[in-house]
Regions:
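A sensor for short, sequence-defined functional sites
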Residues: 1-292
Length: 292
């Protein structure tokens, strides 16, 4: 899939398939024909080791992405072999901290691809709780950057929309009543999704036990390997913003709710907020997570 050198463009076009190097070289030629400066940004993939700072070697290079210069002061990056990518939405394995743009007239330069693009999931849930413990409502979500790429990939690998909805229901432990998406097939950085759902919670005597975070951000710890190699490296920068509005059933009151929390790492790179409020029969949860 990933390569540094290309076959003949005629051969690639005839076969209709090729490595990312094959397709990226064709893209560079097309952009230059259109008058848009474009150059290879060569690198060592993240899973193949870091390029040595003191003695960088061509033997350590194993692939490249396309650096596009739409203006004199702007660079954007694209790997044209990715079906669900976009400008500055690269496979995480290519988001290296050290790549070399190969440009003429002494304009070559070192660049970091670690923080290119914006990756954001913004979701709003409006739902009501019945006396039987059934939460019924809608979830509106905007997926941006890597989140949009992942959603498109999930849809593409499903057999059809029914299978996609079935997997969503299984993952979130809900019944999907309606599913609507916009922008899934567009070359754009975001996808909009609307889900109408039902979710059953536990009812015991006169109590209903509801997790106000109806759709979990993380369902299990990512740090469960028996061995861990340092340093720990996250795939990309990340932002999640969730707002949940729940209406409690008539005749019920909130007996107990989670405490507000604000957690932050010592270097400020990771921040999580959990703020829950109540006004009459309305419970509102605002959850945010940021990884820089």
């Amino acid at each position: 899939k990933y390569a540094l050198y290309s076959k003949s463009p005629k051969q690639v076009l005839k076969e209709g398939t090729g490595s990312n190097a094959d397709i990226n070289f064709i893209l560079i030629s097309m952009l230059k024909d259109a008058g848009i400066p474009a150059y290879p940004a060569v690198m060592s993939r993240r899973d193949m080791g870091i390029l040595p700072y003191s003695h960088p070697s061509i033997q350590k290079l194993n692939t490249f992405v396309v650096a596009i210069s739409p203006t004199d002061s702007t660079l954007v990056y694209l790997d044209s072999s990715v079906e669900n990518g976009y400008l500055n939405v690269l496979p995480p394995v290519l988001m290296t901290n050290r790549a070399r743009i190969i440009a003429p007239d002494n304009h070559s330069q070192w660049v970091s691809l670690e923080n290119v693009g914006s990756n954001l999931l913004r979701s709003s849930v409006k739902a009501g709780i019945s006396s039987e413990g059934v939460v019924t409502g809608t979830r509106e979500t905007v997926y941006i950057g890597q989140y949009a790429s992942r959603l498109r990939n999930k849809y593409r690998t499903a057999k059809d929309s029914t299978e996609f909805a079935s997997k969503l229901a299984s993952e979130e432990n809900i019944q999907v009543k309606k599913l609507q998406m916009e922008g899934r097939t567009h070359f754009s950085p975001q996808v909009y999704e609307l889900v109408e759902f039902e979710k059953q919670y536990t009812v015991n005597d006169q109590f209903i036990y509801v997790n106000p975070l109806v759709f979990l951000h993380v369902s299990e710890s990512p740090f469960k390997q028996s061995e861990r190699k340092l340093p720990v490296e996250f795939p990309y920068t990340d932002q999640v913003s969730l707002t949940i509005n729940l209406t409690i059933p008539e005749g019920y009151t909130v007996d107990e709710k989670p405490e507000n929390q604000r957690l932050q790492t010592s270097d400020g790179q990771v921040l999580c907020r959990y703020i829950i409020t109540q006004q009459n029969n309305q419970v509102t949860l605002r959850y945010s997570f940021r990884l820089q």
